[in-house]
Amino acid sequence: MTRKQKRLAVIGSGMGFLALAAALTFYALGQQTSYFYMPSDLLSQPAAAQERIRLGGLVQQGSVERGQGTHVSFVVADGQNGVPVVYDGILPDLFREEQGVVIEGRMGPDGVFVADTVLAKHDETYMPREVADRLKKDGLWQEQ
């Protein structure tokens, strides 16, 4: 091989490696995507079965029911609709009724959202902007 052919082979191999790395990165990021919904959005456009999503809204007054151990169920509402949620784990200290939450998990076949992560709103700084903006738009935002 001539010097020029070797250089072209190295450049071609390097570009192929970079293309493979980029493809694997985009594939991995696509697997981690979780779409954001408000309860009304989720009820009008149901998520695909077992699709990981984030649900945001307010914990509905009187809906929190504690079960055995760390099992808890509650309803996340946006003023128009509510979605029942079940969670098995330790809730954040700031979790309470009529407080903003963002939960991550999957919608069950029975219409109950099965959460694996619960994030409680402290203030707008700790809440995703889309949740805070939507709550303000719907007139449900509560200042601390």
Curated annotation (Swiss-Prot):
User: Which protein are we looking at?
Assistant: Cytochrome c-type biogenesis protein CcmE
The GO annotation for biological process reads: cytochrome complex assembly
Q: Which residues lie on this side of the membrane: Periplasmic?
A: 29-144
Q: Which residues lie on this side of the membrane: Cytoplasmic?
A: 1-7
User: Could you list the residue ranges that cross the membrane?
Assistant: 8-28
Q: Which GO terms describe its cellular component?
A: plasma membrane
GO molecular function terms listed in the Swiss-Prot or TrEMBL record: heme binding; metal ion binding
NCBIfam families per UniProt: PRK13254.1-1, PRK13254.1-5
Q: How does it sit in the membrane?
A: Single-pass type II membrane protein
Per its UniProt record, what InterPro entries does this chain match?
CcmE, CcmE-like_sf, NA-bd_OB-fold
Family designation = Belongs to the CcmE/CycJ family.
- Residues given in the record as heme binding sites: H122, Y126
UniProt KW keywords: Cell inner membrane, Cell membrane, Cytochrome c-type biogenesis, Heme, Iron, Membrane, Metal-binding, Signal-anchor, Transmembrane, Transmembrane helix
Does the entry feature the keyword Mitochondrion, yes or no? no
Localisation per UniProt entry: Cell inner membrane
Q: What is its main location?
A: membrane
Describe its function: Heme chaperone required for the biogenesis of c-type cytochromes. Transiently binds heme delivered by CcmC and transfers the heme to apo-cytochromes in a process facilitated by CcmF and CcmH.
Top-rank lineage group of the source organism: Bacteria
